[in-house]
Amino acid sequence: MSPQTETKTGFGFKAGVKDYRLNYYTPEYDTKDTDILAAFRMTPQPGVPPEEAGAAVAAESSTGTWTTVWTDGLTSLDRYKGRCYDIEPVAGEENQYIAYVAYPLDLFEEGSVTNMFTSIVGNVFGFKALRALRLEDLRIPPAYSKTFQGPPHGIQAERDKLNKYGRPLLGCTIKPKLGLSAKNYGRAVYECLRGGLDFTKDDENVNSQPFMRWRDRFLFVAEALFKSQAETGEVKGHYLNATAGTCEEMMKRAIFARELGAPIVMHDYLTGGFTANTSLAHYCRDNGLLLHIHRAMHAVIDRQRNHGMHFRVLAKALRMSGGDHVHAGTVVGKLEGEREVTLGFVDSLRDDYIEKDRSRGIYFTQDWVSMPGVFPVASGGIHVWHMPALTEIFGDDSVLQFGGGTLGHPWGNAPGAVANRVASEACVQARNEGRDLAREGNEIIREASKWSPELAAACEVWKEIKFEFETIDTL
């Protein structure tokens, strides 16, 4: 920034432009337990010192603006300003730094992810003094997290509702994602559920299009749910996508799902927005509905490692806003996700207390206190050969979702569901017997396929399918 230039008036107010670091770079600051802490990866413009860039981030995302204003004298900036309290260079990267910023809790409205993000990831991301800026992590203090309801029900309450324990839950996204009539859509749902899956799912862009209006879809899916439940004796669910063009329409769809007796609805939380998502989560808790969350649009925000926001931040925000499931990548499938980084934010979704661990991208210790956990959903390009790795990576408290890996079975949807259920139970049994899923996974699947012709057929179809590309977003 420009050097300090000031004009003193007769009232003691000094007008002009000051370096941000004079007020907002405070390396001597001791963070408070009530502060929201942020870790930004910043790339300053040539000639901008990192201290000035870090201070600019703190200022522009809290109380500061580009020039001194006389109304600063009407409040206590020391109480309300953000502070850049530490800066460290990023190893192996030229002119990149991690800037740590502390925000006083009074800057944020209680229970509002929308307000929190409007400040922390608002206009500052277009600031000219920075070539790029990325929010890597947030520490949400209990004093703030306790103002949020969080997930409508959480992991344990969902297991109790479903009466399903000791294994990952299995799901399937109905394909083709667009173009089916409501009746044929319901037929596909029924076949998958009677074959052994716990859930089926609307794709994220299935809302209410001319080929299949939402009310028709809900009715045929409800029929499929009740029929499959009667035949299998298991609780079944289908993620009925309530996402709509207005909050009022979204709520109308959720209310209709509840009236039909559906156990779960779905929302696209990034395209739908955090305000809509929090409203829906509150309704779901009050009315006994589970809430599945899809993260459509996340890669627009989180995929570039130098600019935007890491998904671990979006995951924490979702836990606060509310959702019982959220898509979290697969590590082994077709979508982006490095193993240790993925497990870092999976822990942030499920666990009560997460220790700082930079090797997994966790910049701050996070204490969620009593906020319920969220099921991570692994979905995208996975099939039966991935089952051992998925079981080993994600454990029991997860939802493994096979779309093409169910509906692409050569014998149809129900045999595809059977193949996935057999593979999952074989992996869980082998793990419980002490076998090493990472080393013996293929052997475990081959053994199970000897007594399951459906699994054997699936193994043959997908034996050569791999998605081996280098991960873009790495530590």
Swiss-Prot record:
One Pfam family hit: RuBisCO_large
PROSITE patterns assigned: RUBISCO_LARGE (PS00157)
Site (Transition state stabilizer): K334
Keyword annotations of the record: Acetylation, Calvin cycle, Carbon dioxide fixation, Chloroplast, Disulfide bond, Lyase, Magnesium, Metal-binding, Methylation, Monooxygenase, Oxidoreductase, Photorespiration, Photosynthesis, Plastid
Binding-site residues, Mg(2+): K201, D203, E204
Domain of life: Eukaryota
Cofactor binding description: Binds 1 Mg(2+) ion per subunit.
CDD domains: RuBisCO_large_I (cd08212)
Keyword hit for Magnesium: yes
Modification type N6-carboxylysine: residues: K201
Compartments where located: Plastid, Chloroplast
Active site: K175, H294
Cofactor list: Mg(2+)
Binding site for substrate: N123, T173, K177, R295, H327, S379
EC class (word): lyase
GO BP: photorespiration; reductive pentose-phosphate cycle
Other remarks on this protein: The basic functional RuBisCO is composed of a large chain homodimer in a 'head-to-tail' conformation. In form I RuBisCO this homodimer is arranged in a barrel-like tetramer with the small subunits forming a tetrameric 'cap' on each end of the 'barrel'.
Primary role: RuBisCO catalyzes two reactions: the carboxylation of D-ribulose 1,5-bisphosphate, the primary event in carbon dioxide fixation, as well as the oxidative fragmentation of the pentose substrate in the photorespiration process. Both reactions occur simultaneously and in competition at the same active site.
Protein name from the UniProt record: Ribulose bisphosphate carboxylase large chain
Gene: rbcL
